[in-house]
């Protein structure tokens, strides 16, 4: 049995929907995040989001100039709101196998050397605190891990359906796994990603062509599939409206048009400029046709609106509180 790795849950659902009609044993399919958790082992315990947050705050407290020079407050509630900037920056460095020293050597960041030195201190403090407390997380794992060979031995091959781009860590990991297990990389080329793909170490030897679907065995360095596909000559309709209400009406009309043309409703996607536009769409979606991927904020729920109205009424100066201990007895009568 093969293990198939996908970049999104939607791809996994599509894979099972396509294969469920076949009377055969299906390959296992998992998300890339789950695969990384299973295939990379550490001698430490994985830090929870709360533990990581507290350790990052402690690392920041050890850096005296962080708040003064970078304006990042280490006061807990302010830090709770802004810590994501630090985590995302350090995670990007970790996944791309880069150090802050590499950035300092780049002319583009020359004017920010003092800021980078402060961030470097915070980063080193954080990694040291993780190790001191026997923790690891997404920032430290790429620097120190071992392959879970028992997990890999459960499958005859690993097939990764690449959608998008690989981080340097993922690229190195696939190369490492390909030395002990058959690894197949499946991807499609286009004018947007061909140059990037040709720079990957394990694809440099291949003469990749544009608009082609490839399946390449990284272990044997051979092409298993090379299939040219035709790009769709898509026609775009561009409209502009001054009012959001008119934009919503246009969206609903286009959805109806697509359905009448025979397009399956589940294959229609509405991409919004921001989440606020979804609020307008909900008002126009009287028949509940739309499934909002972002979910519904609790502030928009009927329960919250009623509770908010009660709270505002109770907070009003004209609110009169009457203690009626026998209320339930009166209602039963």
PLM regions and their residue ranges:
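Conserved short internal alpha-helix adjacent to the catalytic or cofactor-binding core
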Residues: 1-78, 194-333
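Conserved helicase NTPase motor core
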Residues: 107-204, 240
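Basic/charged alpha-beta structural segments of nucleotide/phosphate-handling enzymes
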Residues: 9-153
């Amino acid at each position: 049995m093969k293990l198939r790795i996908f970049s999104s849950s939607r791809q996994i659902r599509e894979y099972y929907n396509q294969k469920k009609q076949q009377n055969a044993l299906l390959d296992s399919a998992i998300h890339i995040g789950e695969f990384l958790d299973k295939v990379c082992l550490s001698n430490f315990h994985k830090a929870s989001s709360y533990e990581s947050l507290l350790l990052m705050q402690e690392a920041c407290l050890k850096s005296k100039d962080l708040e003064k020079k970078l304006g990042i407050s280490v006061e807990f509630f302010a830090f709770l709101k802004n810590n994501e900037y630090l985590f995302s920056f350090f995670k990007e460095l970790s996944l791309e196998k880069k150090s802050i020293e590499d950035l300092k050597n780049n002319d583009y960041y020359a004017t920010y050397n003092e800021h980078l030195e402060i961030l470097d201190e915070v980063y080193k403090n954080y990694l040291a605190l993780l190790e001191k407390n026997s923790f690891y997380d997404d920032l430290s794992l790429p620097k120190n891990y071992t392959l879970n060979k028992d997990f890999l031995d459960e499958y005859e091959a690993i097939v990764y359906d690449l959608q998008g781009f690989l981080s340097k860590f993922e690229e190195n990991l696939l190369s490492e796994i390909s030395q002990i297990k058959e690894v197949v990389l499946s991807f499609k080329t286009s004018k947007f990603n061909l140059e990037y793909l040709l720079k990957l170490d394990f694809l440099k030897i291949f003469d990749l062509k544009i608009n082609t679907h490839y399946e390449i065995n990284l272990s044997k360095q051979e092409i298993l599939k090379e299939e040219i596909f035709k790009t769709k000559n898509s026609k775009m309709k561009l409209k502009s409206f001054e009012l959001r209400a008119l934009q919503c009406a246009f969206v609903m009309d286009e959805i109806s048009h697509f359905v009448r043309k025979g397009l399956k409703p589940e294959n229609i996607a509405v991409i919004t400029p921001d989440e606020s536009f979804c609020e307008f769409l909900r008002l126009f979606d009287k028949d509940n046709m739309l499934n909002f991927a972002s979910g519904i904020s609790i502030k928009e729920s009927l329960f919250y609106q009623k509770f908010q109205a009660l709270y505002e009424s109770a907070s009003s100066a004209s609110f009169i509180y009457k203690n009626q201990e026998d209320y339930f007895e009166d209602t039963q009568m």
